[in-house]
């Protein structure tokens, strides 16, 4: 394409030329696709997407613009989330009462490279059939693109296997969170100072809406990073512990934080694990994790609650999964993906533990699993009553 100002190069040498948007430059990452129709701002600011390039299957991106409220990173350290965004059509002009910024301008300000004019259906099919490749994306406004160099960059990148990316996006210093869920009439609610519970959130790249859901469930959250010791966490005297979401290979993060997680599990305190936190809990309980071929990324994934038989439509964003064949005695699957049968939740006999692979906080996505935060509050209430 002679007029191309952007391109995507895969590690196998395949090149997709198109039109650059957002930030100029070159970045490498793992290419995945996301099937959500809306919520692109939340997706691209989710720290779980660190070192990834997101291909949107929905063709029109940008129609609700961007704003200062719908970002999901909780700290400055977590701002380096997705590196690139690929879409079929040029960025759509914003038309939404909450929009304060054009999406292309927002991409540039965030340092995210955009690429349009791509056959996203063909690229999505390729990922489904061959898995998530290493890739390089570029935006060159002058059109001077070295395609061979892009391919070499993609091939030489280390990839996500063995990468402890949670250590990149978690915050350095502890902080308190009291902001609740957003309401159309009042904006974000503020949790009362006399919140019923105090929760310690272990930050591996925590999404802001997890913290908001905790606040709305009556919990004041103290957020600490994954390098703290179990003794430091227990010194906070929490009523419960949350192992948060995050990016990268769970086995690599477990090498750094595993002993802390095992000790906290042994403490008997109520625990909620989400996404990477769920995988880390699985490792702490004796299971193993494995890399997925194309992962789960979207806001329309059906999972089944194996205890009730209820089917929930949930948001998912992960490229690794707990291997259910490695679960030790006393640990059972609680939820399962109805797309491919992979694990989406764990339950532990005799312990107040809720652990799910999907994102009950949504943002973006359906609210079918919001009840898990209320259930977690119930576990803390029961534990306190002992």
From Swiss-Prot:
GO terms for biological process, alphabetical: 'de novo' pyrimidine nucleobase biosynthetic process; 'de novo' UMP biosynthetic process; glutamine metabolic process; L-arginine biosynthetic process
Active site: 275, 359, 361
Region (CPSase) residue spans: 1-194
Reaction catalysed by this enzyme: hydrogencarbonate + L-glutamine + 2 ATP + H2O = carbamoyl phosphate + L-glutamate + 2 ADP + phosphate + 2 H(+)
Every Glutamine amidotransferase type-1 domain range: 198-386
Function: Small subunit of the glutamine-dependent carbamoyl phosphate synthetase (CPSase). CPSase catalyzes the formation of carbamoyl phosphate from the ammonia moiety of glutamine, carbonate, and phosphate donated by ATP, constituting the first step of 2 biosynthetic pathways, one leading to arginine and/or urea and the other to pyrimidine nucleotides. The small subunit (glutamine amidotransferase) binds and cleaves glutamine to supply the large subunit with the substrate ammonia.
Family membership noted in the UniProt record: Belongs to the CarA family.
HAMAP family the record matches: CPSase_S_chain
Protein name, as recorded: Carbamoyl phosphate synthase small chain
Lineage: Bacteria, Pseudomonadati, Pseudomonadota, Alphaproteobacteria, Hyphomonadales
Gene: carA
């Amino acid at each position: 394409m002679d007029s191309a100002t952007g391109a995507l190069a895969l590690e196998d040498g395949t090149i997709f030329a198109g039109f650059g948007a957002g930030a100029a430059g070159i970045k490498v990452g793992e290419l995945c696709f996301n099937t959500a129709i809306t919520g692109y701002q939340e997706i691209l600011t989710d720290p779980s997407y660190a070192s990834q390039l997101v291909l949107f299957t929905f063709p029109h991106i940008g129609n609700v613009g961007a704003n200062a409220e719908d970002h999901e990173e909780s700290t400055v350290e977590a701002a380096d989330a997705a590196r690139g965004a690929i879409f079929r059509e040029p960025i759509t002009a914003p038309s939404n009462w909450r929009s304060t910024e054009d999406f292309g301008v927002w991409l540039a300000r965030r340092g995210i490279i955009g690429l349009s004019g791509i056959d996203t259906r063909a690229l999505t099919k390729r990922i489904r059939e061959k898995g998530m490749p290493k890739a390089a994306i570029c935006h060159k406004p002058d059109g001077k693109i070295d395609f061979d160099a892009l391919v070499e960059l993609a091939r030489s990148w280390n990839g996500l296997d063995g990468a402890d990316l949670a250590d990149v996006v978690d915050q350095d210093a502890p902080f308190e969170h009291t902001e609740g869920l957003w309401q159309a009439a009042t904006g974000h609610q503020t949790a009362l100072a006399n919140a019923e519970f105090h929760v310690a959130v272990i930050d591996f790249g925590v999404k802001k809406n997890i913290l908001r859901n905790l606040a709305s469930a009556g919990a004041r959250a103290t957020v600490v990073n994954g390098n703290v010791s179990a003794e430091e966490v227990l010194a906070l005297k929490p009523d419960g512990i949350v192992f948060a979401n995050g990016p990268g290979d769970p086995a690599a993060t477990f090498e750094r934080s595993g002993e802390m997680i095992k000790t906290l599990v042994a403490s008997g305190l109520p625990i909620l694990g989400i996404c990477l936190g769920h995988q880390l809990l699985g490792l702490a309980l004796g299971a193993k994790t494995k890399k997925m071929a194309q992962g789960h990324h979207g806001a329309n994934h059906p999972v089944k609650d194996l205890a009730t038989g209820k089917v929930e439509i949930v948001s998912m964003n992960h490229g690794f999964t707990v291997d259910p064949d490695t679960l030790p005695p006393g640990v059972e699957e609680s939820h399962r993906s109805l797309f491919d049968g992979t694990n989406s939740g764990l339950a532990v006999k005799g312990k107040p533990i809720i652990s799910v692979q999907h994102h009950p906080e949504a943002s973006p996505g359906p609210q079918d699993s919001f009840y898990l935060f209320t259930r977690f509050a119930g576990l803390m209430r029961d534990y306190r009553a002992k």
